[in-house]
């Protein structure tokens, strides 16, 4: 701590959770991280200058001094930025990748930047959004994420499998991690694993040579890239975690690697702009309700065609009744010969009606339907207040199926 050579040289890096040597000490080094060779030099230095030879005590002292002089390189970088006042977040993805400059693209990138900043200053904070850059093979999507990480050591694209026992070590020391094509090649089970993985705020594991495992709060965010347009699995409920942005390289102002230094300077100023928003405290790490609604609709452009939902929508447009049930839709909309449908088939129809169809509202109390459906739960058409009133004297006409439920006399039904 007081040695003129070592003072301020040994620090704990809070991003990598390793000890760094941050200034020259008189021997060749090619990495800031403390190595076994560094330890040997330090032992020799302490022996020659102080007569100390107890290796364990010296190593323990190095660990204590490093911890008292800890630093976070990402936070230091962000705190040192000075914004020049020029807006760049809105135009960055268009400049380098040809994306739109609309509010959605702006909000998507802004949210991702603020999530990354928050994870640096408040490790483990809740943030489960993945910015997904889609299309444009060779456009520079991966290069964008790499340059966005500022320092190549803070970037990784080596996270290929989430069930790898070394997955946590591959995350260690990185600020921005790209998952290239991981979602596009995932099946339903692995998509759920990705969702769960993105939702985590910490990992519990033991660093080699440590005695006890510890909670490691996440300091990174995840970006996705895909050349496949329908990279998202079919999910009628939508998924707030995946935020797709289409790239059009032919519309880009400049390729991000055409002048890497200029691109880095632009991105640094974009981080400075994001830091102004972060310091103001006027932000949330999630979309507004209106933007969430837009996201849900927008995600459908990146999913396989939902043919069953289309069949049901076509049927409902032609259907004149006011109630439907899942078995009715199974037979009449999807064209199955009527027999007892499997439960997963009924659940799929329920999913479509509740998430992909508008103008119909579910009812939970079973009602009577014509044969062969009989007593079922289902959906009723939502009446539009602007629809013409075909009733007389203020009374509305009751549909036949509702009259049947009321148990009205058969002659009344015949008169109708």
Regions found by a protein language model. Give the residues of each.
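AAA+/SF3 P-loop NTPase mechanochemical coupling elements
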Residues: 167-172, 207-225
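P-loop NTPase catalytic core of nucleic-acid-dependent motor ATPases
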Residues: 62-172, 176, 334
């Amino acid at each position: 701590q007081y040695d003129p050579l070592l003072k301020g040289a040994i620090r704990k890096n809070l991003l990598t959770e390793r000890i760094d040597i941050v200034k020259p000490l008189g021997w060749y080094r090619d990495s800031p991280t403390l190595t076994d060779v560094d330890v040997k030099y330090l032992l020799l230095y302490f022996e020659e200058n102080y007569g100390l030879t107890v290796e364990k005590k010296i190593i323990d002292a190095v660990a204590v001094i490093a911890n008292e002089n800890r630093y976070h390189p990402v936070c230091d970088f962000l705190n040192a930025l000075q914004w020049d006042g020029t807006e760049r977040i809105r135009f960055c993805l268009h400049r380098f990748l040809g994306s739109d400059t609309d509010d959605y693209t702006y909000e998507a990138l802004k949210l991702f930047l603020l999530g990354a900043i928050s994870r640096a200053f408040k490790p483990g904070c809740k943030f489960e959004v993945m910015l997904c850059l889609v299309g444009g093979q060779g456009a520079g999507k991966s290069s964008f994420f790499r340059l966005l990480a500022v320092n190549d050591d803070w970037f990784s694209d080596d996270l290929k499998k989430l069930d790898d026992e070394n997955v946590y070590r591959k995350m260690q020391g990185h600020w921005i991690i790209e998952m290239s094509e991981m979602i596009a090649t995932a099946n339903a089970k692995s998509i759920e694993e990705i969702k769960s993985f993105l939702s985590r705020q910490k990992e519990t594991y033991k660093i080699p040579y440590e005695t006890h495992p510890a909670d490691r709060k996440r300091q990174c965010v995840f970006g996705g890239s895909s050349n496949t347009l329908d990279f998202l699995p079919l999910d009628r409920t939508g998924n707030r975690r995946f935020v797709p942005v289409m790239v059009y390289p032919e519309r880009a102002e400049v390729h991000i690697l055409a002048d890497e230094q200029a691109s880095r300077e632009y991105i640094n100023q974009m981080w400075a702009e994001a830091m102004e928003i972060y310091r103001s405290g006027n932000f949330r790490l999630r979309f507004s309700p209106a933007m969430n609604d837009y996201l849900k609709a927008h995600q459908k452009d990146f999913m396989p065609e939902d043919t069953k939902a289309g069949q049901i929508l076509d049927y409902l447009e032609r259907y004149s009744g006011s109630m439907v049930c899942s078995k009715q839709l199974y037979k009449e909309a999807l064209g199955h010969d009527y027999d007892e449908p499997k439960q997963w088939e009924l659940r799929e129809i329920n999913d479509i009606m509740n998430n992909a169809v508008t103008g119909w509202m579910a009812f939970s109390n079973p009602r009577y339907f014509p044969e062969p459906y009989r007593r079922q739960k289902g959906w009723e058409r939502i009446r539009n207040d602007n629809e013409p009133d075909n009733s007389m004297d203020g009374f509305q006409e009751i549909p036949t199926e509702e009259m049947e439920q009321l148990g009205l006399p058969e002659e009344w039904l015949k008169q109708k």
